[in-house]
């Protein structure tokens, strides 16, 4: 992995993007979304994993995360990707499960694994997380806004907090919960929240 893509601060805030290989729309199916979310919940409970903001889109995940000592963020992310990839493949390879795209998905994931030094038969996640260390309140706020507005820009919802698979409901405090609890950064008030509370004239 390139040095520029390494997580330097294992316990600080990092913004990361985790795309599915080939940008395949894997997460249009609830079963694959639940694999990701269940694994996150496990990491939160057992591996010191803190998810401060996130959105789960059809073909990628954006998140701001940190890790409590003695755990290391890069190791938790590695294990999370391995586990979710393994569970996804198990589901795809079990022909008793309903999946109309089974052959197509397995073909694509095997194709993208060809010639890779990791010597995998299938590759589901792109290997890099593209971490960006967050060092100021302004940058943190910008990234939270970007994450939460993803579903709005894609046309899936009108308001960020209406996207179930994100932390926006926690920040908006308008709904009981999103899909996975978020460790809210209490000092940060996202710009989009002001926008929807005050209206465009407040900008």
Q: What is each model feature region?
A:
Residues 1-203:
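Short catalytic/metal-binding and nucleic-acid-binding patches
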């Amino acid at each position: 992995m390139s040095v520029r893509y390494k997580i330097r601060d294992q316990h600080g805030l990092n913004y990361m993007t985790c795309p599915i290989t080939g940008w395949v729309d894997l997460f249009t199916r609830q079963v694959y979304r639940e694999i990701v979310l269940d694994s996150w919940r496990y990491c939160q409970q057992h591996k010191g994993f803190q998810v401060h903001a996130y959105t789960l889109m059809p073909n990628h995940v954006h998140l701001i995360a940190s890790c409590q000592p003695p755990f290391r963020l890069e190791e938790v992310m590695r294990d999370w990707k391995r586990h979710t990839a393994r569970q996804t493949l198990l589901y795809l390879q079990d022909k008793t499960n309903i999946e109309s795209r089974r052959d197509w998905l397995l073909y694509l994931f095997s194709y993208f694994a060809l010639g890779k030094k990791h010597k995998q038969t299938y590759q589901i996640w792109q290997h890099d997380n593209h971490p960006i260390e967050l060092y100021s309140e302004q940058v943190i706020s910008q990234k939270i806004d970007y994450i939460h507005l993803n579903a709005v820009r894609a046309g899936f919802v009108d308001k960020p907090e209406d996207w179930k698979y994100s932390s926006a409901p926690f920040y908006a405090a308008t709904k009981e919960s999103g899909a996975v609890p978020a460790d809210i950064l209490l000092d940060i008030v996202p710009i989009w929240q002001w926008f929807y509370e005050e209206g465009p004239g407040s900008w």
